Amino acid sequence: MNKHPWKNQLSEMVQPSGGPAEDQDMLGEESSLGKPAMLHLPSEQGTPETLQRCLEENQELRDAIRQSNQMLRERCEELLHFQVSQREEKEFLMCKFQEARKLVERLSLEKLDLRSQREQALKELEQLKKCQQQMAEDKASVKAQVTSLLGELQESQSRLEAATKDRQALEGRIRAVSEQVRQLESEREVLQQQHSVQVDQLRMQNQSVEAALRMERQAASEEKRKLAQLQAAYHQLFQDYDSHIKSSKGMQLEDLRQQLQQAEEALVAKQELIDKLKEEAEQHKIVMETVPVLKAQADIYKADFQAERHAREKLVEKKEYLQEQLEQLQREFNKLKVGCHESARIEDMRKRHVETPQPPLLPAPAHHSFHLALSNQRRSPPEEPPDFCCPKCQYQAPDMDTLQIHVMECIE
């Protein structure tokens, strides 16, 4: 039970004696251990001195034992403290050992993880090399497409210049018609002397001319509206081009192709409108040669022609502005042509490295916005159709030529 039996023995050794009897016992024990035999010799004269000396020796022995006992206690406490410190150090070393074991296990797991990451990186490097080869092939095909698009762009510019020349010729004819209107003013006095039937006929023909003017105005307004829609579609195309220039080179080329096709269609529509205006100008010329008009009506007609000429000059300015925008777009396209290859390749590489790959951007939004602009242009609110109605019998004619024939027959 007791871990230190020697400690109990020491405590028994340091118990103080109770009295002279005990001293005598101790003296007997000391004599048995080898003390001189003269202490036990009975002597009446030497007994008090001997007893006093024994007591002093006993006291000295007690002091020595007490000091020895105190030293032993201090030594025992030091040993206990040392044992406690050794136990704490052992626990600390065990804790450090457990931490070191956990650290070794964690480092082993990290080593396995790094090894798997290294293998994954090698696989990705192989994929990147394959992608680089594919990008080189795509670069050659894109260069060929850009060359073909530049040729188409030059062809469309030549067509635009031809349309501008035709428009200038048409304006010259309009000025000639205005000169004829001034000549008709001098004939106004003679025309006022004619028969009342001729006056009615002139009024009917005047109404037909006004209807033709309304048609021409509507055609001009339609042309302005189409030009505004074309300009809006052009701005929309430019925005789509600017937003998708970094995502896909093929989409840019497709947008430019659609834009060139739209410009060609617009030029064809302009050419048809110019031909129609030429025919109407010829009809007006015939009408002005055969049917005189009142001065007020001639002034109105002249003012309308001047307004139309002013409007056409504005249209010319707008077309020149669009031509400048087209040239600026071509210059920007040439500047961005080289940078787009690198940006597209970097973007594709970045998309392949993300954890959740995003679907590639398709050129559908640009085409959709372009076709939406065209559909909005085609589905614009319809204008009010011209009223080809006979003022005498209220006959509703389908077109201006039919109305003129009917009016002549109705008057006769």
Swiss-Prot record:
Residues of crosslink Glycyl lysine isopeptide (Lys-Gly) (interchain with G-Cter in SUMO)? K270, K302
Q: Which UniProt keywords apply?
A: Coiled coil, Cytoplasm, Disulfide bond, DNA damage, Isopeptide bond, Metal-binding, Nucleus, Phosphoprotein, Transcription, Transcription regulation, Ubl conjugation, Zinc, Zinc-finger
* Region described as Interaction with TANK: 150-250
Q: Which InterPro entries match?
A: CC2-LZ_dom, NEMO_N, NEMO_ZF, Optineurin/NFkB_EssMod
- Region Ubiquitin-binding (UBAN): which residues? 242-343
Q: What does the entry list under GO cellular component?
A: cytoplasm; IkappaB kinase complex; mitotic spindle; nucleus; spindle pole; ubiquitin ligase complex
Q: Where in the cell is it found?
A: Cytoplasm; Nucleus
User: Where are residues bearing Phosphoserine located in the sequence?
Assistant: S31, S43, S68, S85, S369, S380
Q: Where is this region: Required for interaction with TNFAIP3?
A: 249-412
Task: Give the consequence of mutating E313A.
Answer: Impairs linear polyubiquitin-binding. Abolishes linear polyubiquitin-binding, no effect on 'Lys-63'-linked polyubiquitin-binding and impairs NF-kappa-B activation. Abolishes linear polyubiquitin-binding
User: Per the record's keyword annotation, is Transmembrane helix included, yes or no?
Assistant: no
Q: For the cross-link Glycyl lysine isopeptide (Lys-Gly) (interchain with G-Cter in ubiquitin), list the residue numbers.
A: 111, 139, 143, 226, 246, 270, 276, 278, 285, 295, 302, 314, 318-319, 392
- Let me see what the UniProt entry remarks about domains: The leucine-zipper domain and the CCHC NOA-type zinc-fingers constitute the UBAN region and are essential for polyubiquitin binding and for the activation of IRF3.
Q: What does this protein do?
A: Regulatory subunit of the IKK core complex which phosphorylates inhibitors of NF-kappa-B thus leading to the dissociation of the inhibitor/NF-kappa-B complex and ultimately the degradation of the inhibitor. Its binding to scaffolding polyubiquitin plays a key role in IKK activation by multiple signaling receptor pathways. Can recognize and bind both 'Lys-63'-linked and linear polyubiquitin upon cell stimulation, with a much highr affinity for linear polyubiquitin. Could be implicated in NF-kappa-B-mediated protection from cytokine toxicity. Essential for viral activation of IRF3.
Q: How does it assemble?
A: Homodimer; disulfide-linked. Component of the I-kappa-B-kinase (IKK) core complex consisting of CHUK, IKBKB and IKBKG; probably four alpha/CHUK-beta/IKBKB dimers are associated with four gamma/IKBKG subunits. The IKK core complex seems to associate with regulatory or adapter proteins to form a IKK-signalosome holo-complex. The IKK complex associates with TERF2IP/RAP1, leading to promote IKK-mediated phosphorylation of RELA/p65. Part of a complex composed of NCOA2, NCOA3, CHUK/IKKA, IKBKB, IKBKG and CREBBP. Interacts with COPS3, CYLD, NALP2, TRPC4AP and PIDD1.
Record's protein name: NF-kappa-B essential modulator
Query: In which organism is this protein found?
Result: Mus musculus
Q: Which gene encodes it?
A: Ikbkg
